């Protein structure tokens, strides 16, 4: 409803361009058929999971943008962000990198709730902003763009190890039970192709 309201506002006020902030999560699970997600990739999302609402809402938002492009002649661009990090992170953030840093600052070992083999793209927040501005200013109407930097792709266990080493702590693996696991993303490999 929020995205539709913003699109209606943009049409009503003759916006020059509408940017819909999307996410790498729209790609769903990597089934091993690609190394990197390009903007045309369509992965599997199990809609019968606790976390399905977020990636599905982003997919629906993108589809709604395309409808407004066609039906209302609205100029739209879709930057797809990946996991960002930097000085804007909050103590209350529940993302893995935030929790790792929080534990390190508190002088505690870093606890991984998986084997840590998830392989993700990360983007420094200033680079994410630069990518966003580039898409707004230079992107083509109706196109989606991955905001990513291959140099920042890393396995979760390696990221945890870097932070733990810097803090003089250890990485501890505590695999979750099924109830706790239900709240986590099923994606194990989400590396974006940011070349577009």
Each PLM stretch: what is its role?
Residues 7, 66, 98-102, 133:
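Solvent-exposed, non-membrane alpha-helical residues enriched in polar/charged side chains
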Residues 60, 64, 68, 100, ...:
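Hydrophobic alpha-helix immediately C-terminal to the catalytic Tyr-X-X-X-Lys motif of short-chain
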Residues 32-37, 91-95, 99, 125-127, ...:
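Short, glycine/charged-enriched secondary-structure capping and boundary segments
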Residues 1-8, 12, 16-17, 25-26, ...:
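Catalytic helix-loop patch of NAD(P)-dependent Rossmann-fold dehydrogenases
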Residues 50-54, 82-94, 114-125, 149-152:
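Glycine-rich "substrate-gating" loop/helix at the edge of Rossmann-like oxidoreductase active sites
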Residues 104-196:
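C-terminal substrate-binding subdomain of Rossmann-fold SDR/epimerase-dehydratase oxidoreductases
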């Amino acid at each position: 409803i929020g995205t539709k309201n913003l699109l209606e506002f943009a049409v009503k006020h003759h916006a020059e361009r509408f940017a819909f902030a999307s996410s790498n999560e729209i790609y769903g699970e990597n089934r091993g058929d690609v190394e990197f997600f390009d903007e045309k990739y369509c992965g599997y999302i199990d809609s019968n999971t606790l976390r399905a609402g977020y990636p599905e809402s982003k997919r629906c938002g993108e589809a709604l943008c395309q409808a407004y492009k066609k039906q209302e002649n609205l100029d739209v661009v879709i930057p797809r962000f990946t996991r960002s990090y930097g000085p804007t992170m909050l103590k209350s953030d529940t993302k893995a990198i935030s929790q790792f840093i929080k534990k390190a600052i508190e002088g505690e070992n870093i606890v991984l709730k998986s084997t840590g083999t998830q392989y993700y793209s990360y983007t420094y927040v200033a680079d994410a902003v630069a990518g966003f501005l580039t898409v707004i200013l230079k992107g083509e109407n109706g196109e989606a763009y991955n905001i990513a930097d291959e140099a920042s792709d890393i396995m979760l266990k390696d990221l945890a190890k870097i932070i733990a080493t810097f803090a003089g702590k250890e990485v501890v693996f505590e695999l979750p039970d099924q109830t706790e696991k239900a709240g986590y993303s099923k994606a194990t490999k989400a590396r974006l192709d940011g070349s577009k």
